[in-house]
């Protein structure tokens, strides 16, 4: 059984065991009577067996999602706006005007083209000011990447820093500053506090009259830590100002939380490390256009009384299986399923194989040979934004989750 069909089967079985009217969205009308019969025959044995089966089913689902256990997010878990916007761009939701990503975010075509998983990491709040020259301000950030699975190959990584427009002043028109990003090769020596051995990863000269996020390539450092298993001593960020006094330094590049800033506000403006990786399963992230998918399915909706093989609606609601506490988006999705007769002779629109045509022909003269079956012939992926077991936000592409076409096979 292909992974997509396994996924649908397990979800349906979970709903049968859970029972109740609240789960009707996952059970087609034609199957409700059968569900009632199963529940009736189960009797007193249902409770214990159901819980045991549910555990097995959930374990199977979590394994398919690449998780070792059911995530239980803490109340302090934060979903970065960047990850929400990236999900909307990747899934095609940016076509809806009211959900346009903020800040003019552009979809990262190049890093996403080699990845099926995007992960975000906030620094460990272990912020160290690094003493430097009078015109510089430098900070060290430590990111814990231990939650990245061993089978996930990182292809690229970026550090995102938020900077605010500097108030106008005498040097406003010619005001520039340079942001340097370093990998810390060795931690501060005890004999020389604050002194770091670093290597430059990326640098940018920016004008201070714009409020925006800046993205820096830190792939060499993250690849050393994950692929080569080298020690992770963090990143150093240095901001060099050319036309400001020491009192104005670092105030517009958000590297640390101010005393007057609330925790909620700071959470959305903290430095963010984003990794792009691939676990070897399925295809890379690709932007999808929702409008095209909707138009594609309109012809099948008109044939409501047709009993022949076709696609039927099947909405999977993650709240029905108690997963809405860790799955951020989507709240559910239209999985669809295939059902119907494969009559003789098979017409071209049944999308049949030569073998199915021969099998149907033989069935017409010998009923002991079964008819061809109505099955999915085309499947597509969905993207999920969720919190993993370590409260890290993950955007992942899951293959073969949506039935796009049915046929007799």
UniProtKB/Swiss-Prot annotation:
Propeptide residue interval(s): 20-293
Disulfide bond among keywords: yes
Subcellular localization, as worded in the UniProt entry: Secreted, Extracellular space, Extracellular matrix
Disulfide bond entries: 309-374, 338-406, 342-408
The entry's keywords: Chondrogenesis, Cleavage on pair of basic residues, Cytokine, Developmental protein, Differentiation, Disulfide bond, Extracellular matrix, Glycoprotein, Growth factor, Osteogenesis, Phosphoprotein, Secreted, Signal
Modified sites of kind Phosphoserine: 91
Signal peptide: 1-19
SMART domains assigned to the protein according to its UniProt record, in alphabetical order: TGFB (SM00204)
One of the record's GO molecular function terms: cytokine activity
InterPro entries associated with the record: BMP4_TGF_beta-like, Cystine-knot_cytokine, TGF-b_C, TGF-b_propeptide, TGF-beta-rel, TGFb_CS
Record region (Disordered): 91-110
Keyword Transmembrane set for record: no
Positions of glycan attachment: 144, 209, 351, 366
CDD domains tied to this protein: TGF_beta_BMP4_BMP2B
Major localization class: secreted
Record GO biological process: blood vessel endothelial cell proliferation involved in sprouting angiogenesis; chondrocyte differentiation; deltoid tuberosity development; endochondral ossification; glomerular capillary formation; heart induction; hematopoietic progenitor cell differentiation; kidney development
Cellular component aspect of the GO annotation: extracellular space
Family indicated by similarity: Belongs to the TGF-beta family.
Functional description taken from the UniProt entry: Growth factor of the TGF-beta superfamily that plays essential roles in many developmental processes, including neurogenesis, vascular development, angiogenesis and osteogenesis. Acts in concert with PTHLH/PTHRP to stimulate ductal outgrowth during embryonic mammary development and to inhibit hair follicle induction. Initiates the canonical BMP signaling cascade by associating with type I receptor BMPR1A and type II receptor BMPR2. Once all three components are bound together in a complex at the cell surface, BMPR2 phosphorylates and activates BMPR1A.
Subunit structure: Homodimer; disulfide-linked. Interacts with GREM2. Part of a complex consisting of TWSG1 and CHRD. Interacts with the serine proteases, HTRA1 and HTRA3; the interaction with either inhibits BMP4-mediated signaling. The HTRA protease activity is required for this inhibition. Interacts with SOSTDC1. Interacts with FBN1 (via N-terminal domain) and FBN2. Interacts with type I receptor BMPR1A. Interacts with type II receptor BMPR2. Interacts with FSTL1; this interaction inhibits the activation of the BMP4/Smad1/5/8 signaling pathway. Interacts with SCUBE3. Interacts with TGFBR3.
PANTHER family on file: BONE MORPHOGENETIC PROTEIN 4 (PTHR11848:SF165), TGF-BETA FAMILY (PTHR11848)
Name this protein carries in UniProt: Bone morphogenetic protein 4
Organism: Oryctolagus cuniculus
Organism taxonomic ancestry: Eukaryota, Metazoa, Chordata, Craniata, Vertebrata
Gene: BMP4
């Amino acid at each position: 059984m292909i992974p997509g069909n396994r996924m649908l089967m397990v979800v349906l079985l979970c709903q049968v065991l859970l029972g109740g009217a609240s789960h009707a969205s996952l059970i087609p009308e034609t199957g409700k009577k059968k569900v009632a019969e199963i529940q009736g025959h189960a009797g007193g044995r249902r409770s214990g067996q159901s819980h045991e089966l549910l555990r097995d089913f959930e374990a199977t689902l979590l394994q398919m999602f690449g998780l070792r256990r059911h995530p239980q997010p803490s109340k302090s878990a934060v979903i970065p706006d960047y990850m929400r916007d990236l999900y909307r761009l990747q899934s095609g939701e940016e076509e809806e005007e009211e959900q346009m990503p903020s800040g003019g975010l552009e979809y990262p075509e190049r890093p996403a083209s080699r990845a099926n998983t995007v992960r975000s990491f906030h620094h460990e709040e272990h912020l160290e000011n690094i003493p430097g020259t009078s015109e510089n301000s430098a900070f060290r950030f430590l990111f814990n990447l231990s939650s990245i699975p061993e089978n996930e190959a990182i292809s690229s990584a970026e550090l995102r820093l938020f900077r605010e427009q500097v108030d106008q002043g005498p040097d406003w028109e010619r005001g520039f500053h340079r942001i340097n990003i370093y990998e810390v090769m060795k931690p501060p020596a005890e004999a020389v506090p604050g002194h770091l051995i670093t290597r430059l990863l990326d640098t940018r000269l920016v004008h201070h009259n714009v409020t925006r996020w800046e993205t820096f390539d830190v792939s060499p450092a993250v690849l050393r830590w994950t692929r080569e298993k080298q020690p992770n001593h963090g990143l150093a960020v240095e901001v060099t100002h050319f036309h400001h006094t020491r009192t104005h330094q670092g105030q517009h590049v958000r590297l640390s939380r101010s005393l007057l800033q609330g925790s909620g506000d700071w959470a959305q403006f903290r430095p963010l490390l984003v990794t792009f990786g691939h676990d070897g399963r399925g295809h890379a992230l690709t932007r999808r256009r929702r409008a095209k998918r909707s138009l594609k399915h309109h012809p099948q909706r008109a044939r409501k009384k047709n009993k022949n093989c076709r696609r039927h609606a099947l909405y999977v609601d993650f709240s029905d299986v108690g997963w809405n506490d860790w799955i951020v988006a989507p709240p559910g999705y239209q999985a669809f399923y295939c059902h119907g007769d494969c009559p003789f002779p098979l017409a071209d629109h049944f999308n049949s194989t030569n073998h199915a045509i021969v099998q149907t022909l033989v069935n017409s003269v010998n009923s002991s040979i079964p008819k061809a079956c109505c099955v999915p012939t085309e499947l597509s992926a969905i993207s999920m934004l969720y919190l993993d077991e370590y409260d890290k936000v993950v955007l992942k592409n899951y293959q073969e989750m949506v039935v796009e076409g049915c046929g007799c096979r």
